[in-house]
Structure formats: structure tokens, C-alpha cells
Design a protein with these regions (language model features):
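Fe(II)/2-oxoglutarate oxygenase catalytic core
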Residues: 1-113, 121-156
Length: 156
């Protein structure tokens, strides 16, 4: 998980840019799927302000099939996860993400944002390039409001 030092203006600004960009992507996703928000608890979704920033060396990657929903009680409240996102920070041939049930592969292209359901309907894994490194940011979109989440976080 990325821990942003709020006293470091550069890292704080980078975090905010990423969250704002994903929030804009979420708005577009919901514009294309108007019923999606309506069926969520509280009819609200928000981009979790905690996310992962991962750099994989050549030959490394998350090869295991997985989904992003779980019932653990960690600080990111995974039981509230509705959507997951991946932001590719560089272009890497023969990398990206593959989705099992959809039999679909997304190439790793710098600036590309993927938003997809976090549950078992979208089991996925990373594709690994043996000669180039890959950097991605990944996170989640939860049901509810950011304000409610931050309130719960401050009380824990």
C-alpha cells in the first residue's frame, strides 16, 4: 500500500492526481452504466484513497489468478469493494492483464486505466515480460461515500 507522507507536497500531489484521474474514469464508467450506481448500497461509489504502487522487475509479476473482493477486515474495507482499477505507468509489450472468464487481454499501455468488477466474475492475473520492468498503480472503488469511509477510518 502507498503511504503518503502528508508533509511531503510532491508525494501528496501525486497521490491526489492519481485519485482524481481514477475518479474521472469512474464517472465515465458510470455514465456508460447508469444502473450500476443505483444498485449499490447508498447509491454511491468512491475511489478509495489508499492504493498500491507496484514496480515489477523483468520476469516478475502477479501471475496467480485472483479477484479483488474478499471478506478480510483490513483498512481498505474489502467487503465494500465493488470495482477494481489498474493504471499502467509505462508501456510494456507482452505484459498487461488477462481476464479468465472473458478470455480477454489488456495490453500495458502508459496512461491506460482499467476499471472492472472486483468480484469473481472478473478473475484476472498479470502478464509478465521477461525483459522489461513494469510499473502499475492499483486500487479499489468501494460502495458508500469517501466521507463515511474517512470517518470510520478516523474512529479505528
Amino acid at each position: 500500500l502507498v503511504a503518503i507522507d502528508r508533509t511531503d507536497p510532491e508525494s501528496c500531489a501525486l497521490s491526489e492526481v492519481i485519485v482524481r484521474g481514477v475518479s474521472a474514469g469512474l464517472d465515465r464508467y458510470l455514465d456508460e452504466r447508469p444502473l450500476f450506481r443505483e444498485v449499490c448500497p447508498d447509491q454511491a461509489l468512491f475511489v478509495l484513497p489508499i492504493f498500491n504502487l507496484q514496480r515489477y522487475a523483468p520476469g516478475e509479476g502477479f501471475r496467480q489468478w485472483h479477484c479483488d473482493w474478499t471478506i478480510s477486515d483490513e483498512v481498505t474495507e474489502p467487503v465494500h469493494r465493488v470495482l477494481a482499477w489498474i493504471l499502467y505507468c509505462d508501456t510494456v509489450a507482452e505484459a498487461g492483464t488477462e481476464f479468465h472468464w472473458q478470455q480477454h487481454h489488456e495490453e500495458a499501455v502508459r496512461g491506460k486505466l482499467l476499471i472492472f468488477p472486483a468480484g469473481p466474475s472478473h478473475i484476472h492475473r498479470g502478464r509478465v515480460n521477461r525483459t522489461h520492468s513494469k510499473t502499475i498503480a492499483t486500487g479499489w472503488i468501494n460502495a458508500g461515500t469517501r466521507e463515511g469511509y474517512l470517518r470510520r477510518l478516523s474512529q479505528s
